[in-house]
């Protein structure tokens, strides 16, 4: 890894834990076992689920590309696919739309909205922008400086 790439990783804050340059599909698959890295080989059905989520987030065509060579937006989308791959009951998202272009912001908002509409699903989402919040939320906590 060159100095420029290491610098870019430190600046992005998203990928430092993925210093092994694994294919994007393996990064998504690591979400099946909540691990950083892929230590247990997923079976064909699990890999199909990973590819499905990558398709939902619009990055299936990048499944074999080295994760660290993806753009920051593509990395974000792959990591979001990783978060959803296990169909969690509780999903915690920290600024999931950060760094995405308008098209992908819209795409991710729709996916988040669909997740929030499902029964027995809970999501905690951190954002600086109220317009990024799903319309289906039932509770909101706003933090304001000095209050």
Which residues fall in each region the model found?
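Conserved ABC ATPase signature
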Residues: 66-70
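Conserved catalytic motifs of ABC-family nucleotide-binding domains
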Residues: 87
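Catalytic Walker B motif of ABC-type/P-loop ATPase nucleotide-binding domains
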Residues: 91-95
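Conserved ABC ATPase "signature" region
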Residues: 29, 44-62
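Helix N-cap at the start of a conserved alpha-helix in ABC-type nucleotide-binding domains
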Residues: 102-104
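Hydrophobic anchor residue at the start of the ABC signature
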Residues: 80-81
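H-loop/switch region of ABC-family ATPase nucleotide-binding domains
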Residues: 127-128
């Amino acid at each position: 890894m060159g100095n420029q790439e290491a610098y870019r990783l430190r600046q992005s804050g998203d990928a430092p834990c993925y210093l092994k340059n694994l294919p994007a599909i393996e990064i998504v698959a690591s979400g099946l076992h909540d691990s950083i890295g892929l230590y247990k080989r997923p079976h064909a059905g699990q890999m199909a689920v990973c590819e499905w989520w990558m398709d939902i987030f619009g990055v299936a065509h990048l499944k074999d590309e080295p994760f660290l060579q993806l753009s920051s937006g593509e990395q974000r989308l792959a990591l979001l696919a990783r978060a959803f791959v296990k169909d969690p009951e509780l999903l915690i998202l920290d600024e999931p739309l950060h760094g995405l272009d308008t098209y992908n912001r819209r795409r991710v908002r729709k996916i988040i909205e669909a997740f929030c509409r499902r029964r027995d699903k809970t999501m905690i989402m951190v954002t600086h922008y109220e317009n990024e919040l799903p319309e289906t939320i039932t509770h909101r906590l706003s933090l304001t400086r000095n209050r």
